[in-house]
Amino acid sequence: MKSTETTCKKDNMGLTPSQIVNELNRFIVGQDKAKKAVAIALRNRYRRKRVEGNLRNEIVPKNILMIGSTGVGKTEIARRLAKLTNSPFYKIEATKFTEVGYVGRDVESIIRDLVEIAVNTEKALAKIAVDINAREKAIERILDSLVGKTSSSETREKFKEKVLNGELDDTEIEISVADTTPVGGGSFEIPCIPGASMGVLNLGDMIGRALGSSKTKTKKMLIKDAMTVIIPEESEKLIDQEKIIQKAINLAENDGIVFIDEIDKIASTSNSGAKNAEVSREGVQRDLLPLIEGTTVNTKYGPVKTDHILFIASGAFHIAKPSDLLPELQGRLPIRVELNLLTKDDMIKILLEPETSLIKQYSALIGTEEVHLEFTDSAIEKIADYAITVNLEVEDIGARRLHTILENLLEDISFEASEMKVKKIIIDDKFVENQLSKIITNLDLAKFVL
């Protein structure tokens, strides 16, 4: 099962466009046009839900095409937008897909994965809601094993208090738990047949459902370990699986966001080379058309409509142009947003301003060793200078260049911090120059190191 980042739901769908942009500004520097476009798209979802009658179903999202080099914030804008609204979010590269009928991933797997994320999100929220009851039931099962089902209420209460206080954490008990060993051999994937691909199915689950029972096995475990196994088991019993699946499908259909990166790589150009490659790229585009326009995809949880899922496509378009995409696909991505290349000022802001800026992250990491890092303004400026220089001379990877530069800059400190006697280190422009100047001036070396 895929893990998803889950938080308690907040009603952020009603945020105004300006409020959405302000939220995005907390984490992302610049790119105001892109922020404005996604803010309007999100607000329109809220507006659509307030429209009454049949007209609501006719209002479809205006999908977005983001144009910009790598590292300028395309993915981060979409990801933060989804996190802001607790929407199911799925990112995939267009180059991962092959045309239906060829070996490889088909585009419908996008929706299957999106629904899987939505199910995991809803399930995690449901488990939070039943956590207290699940813990109570788990403790009762442990007490049954510890003192027996027929023990007096006084005895059970006495041992319950010890379990809750952690006094018996290292006591070994014998307890019956669910047997998660696959029956008949693990999972398999239905072959790629157009319209019939349902995703990964677990053969053991299918047999278990058919027999109408679940296997258990008796294990010897410490009480503290048993709690981590039994609480999830009891949570599963308390939550309504059918209700979760229905809520997840509804969430994916109405609030889902799909981010398709590198869409320029499947655009056909006159310089594309092999004819077979052109046909394959065009085939993937044609497969994407019904998905973006609105269709029904069969998943293991049931049919999912894609009519109201927001699709955000992006690409650098250094070689291909947006007009090289199929005209039909261009029409399904009506909102075009061009993201700006990052300047030196942008790099400085990225280092300092976001709530989770890189400088704050590295300072916090080294701070756990009780070593305080202090960056001077001149050091920040020098780091930004080097990032721009390497991007221009080697390859432009945008803000991602800052990660490689800071890793090299702080490599020795990171290695020695746990044994340092000095508790404060000032990073100034001279320190930056001493650490990085040899690499920056040797561009052949910079290609490999930075």
Curated annotation (Swiss-Prot):
Sequence similarity: Belongs to the ClpX chaperone family. HslU subfamily.
Origin species: Rickettsia typhi (strain ATCC VR-144 / Wilmington)
Q: What Pfam families does this protein map onto?
A: AAA_2 (PF07724), MCM (PF00493)
Q: Recorded GO terms, molecular function?
A: ATP binding; ATP hydrolysis activity; DNA binding; peptidase activity; proteasome-activating activity
Keywords, A to Z, come to: ATP-binding, Chaperone, Cytoplasm, Nucleotide-binding
GO BP term (any one): protein unfolding
Official protein name in the record:
ATP-dependent protease ATPase subunit HslU
Assembly mode: A double ring-shaped homohexamer of HslV is capped on each side by a ring-shaped HslU homohexamer. The assembly of the HslU/HslV complex is dependent on binding of ATP.
UniProt cross-references to NCBIfam families, sorted A to Z: hslU, PRK05201.1
Instruction: Give me the residues that bind ATP, please.
Output: V29, G71, V72, G73, K74, T75, E76, D261, E328, R400
What cellular-component terms does GO give this entry? HslUV protease complex
Where does this protein chiefly localize?
cytoplasm
User: What does the function comment of this entry state?
Assistant: ATPase subunit of a proteasome-like degradation complex; this subunit has chaperone activity. The binding of ATP and its subsequent hydrolysis by HslU are essential for unfolding of protein substrates subsequently hydrolyzed by HslV. HslU recognizes the N-terminal part of its protein substrates and unfolds these before they are guided to HslV for hydrolysis.
Localisation? Cytoplasm
Q: Which CDD domains match?
A: RecA-like_HslU
